Amino acid sequence: MGRILLARHGNTFGPGDTPVWVGAKEDLPLVESGEAQARALGEALQAAGITPARLICGPLKRTRRAAEIVAGLTGFAGQTEIDPRLTEIDYGSWGGKSNDEIVAEFGQEALDCWDKRHTRPDGVDWSPSDAELKANALAAMADAASSRGLALVITSNGILRYMHAALSGDDGNAKVKTGNLCAAELGGTTGSRLFWNEKPDADLIARHFG
């Protein structure tokens, strides 16, 4: 069995911005508050006395920058690994649209399907396929859990929802807020959630990984 930390990158919209759906093709950088969220994660790890043995992230700017900030604060001296399986979902014609625009074009039920029930709406032009996303989520976690030492995985909300679905435990809410942290324990092809969607906290991290 191996334990891993999973984190969502920080904010990509500032206070005056209208949030839109940001997928694989919307490669936005972290805004100032998003960088602060990455620093909060790095500082929590530092306070818990933990330096990751591996730091793994998706190829998009927002996850790579978050990993860079965490590496600098924790004294991580290795090479950050870029795993394409951690790339956010390509939301197709939903990408770049606000929730109001999506409801107007596709209907409230389609939005609720993903936002409230955490299932992919019927007929959407998202990619990869549902099956591929599920397989990638479990494989990426299993690979990270095979590390000698703690692996920290930084990815995006859509991928974290598929990771949540691949793990056992209290179902709860699969959504992970920007900058928040999750933990899982993997063994073979199965795994369980240790905690989900928590603000980075040194005591919480030390309790599970100290």
Region locations from a protein language model:
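Short beta-strand scaffold positions
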Residues: 57-58, 135, 154-155
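Alpha-helix capping/helix-boundary segments
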Residues: 62, 159-160
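Active-site metal-binding loops of divalent metal-dependent hydrolases
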Residues: 10, 157-158
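Generic beta-sheet signal
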Residues: 4, 53, 147-155
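Phosphate-handling substructures
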Residues: 28-29, 73-136, 195-196, 205-210
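Acidic, low-complexity terminal tails and accessory targeting/binding regions
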Residues: 1-3, 89-103, 161-210
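Active-site-proximal alpha-helix that buttresses catalytic centers in soluble enzyme cores
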Residues: 2-3, 7-78
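Generic structural signal for well-ordered alpha-helical scaffold segments
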Residues: 39-46, 134-145, 164
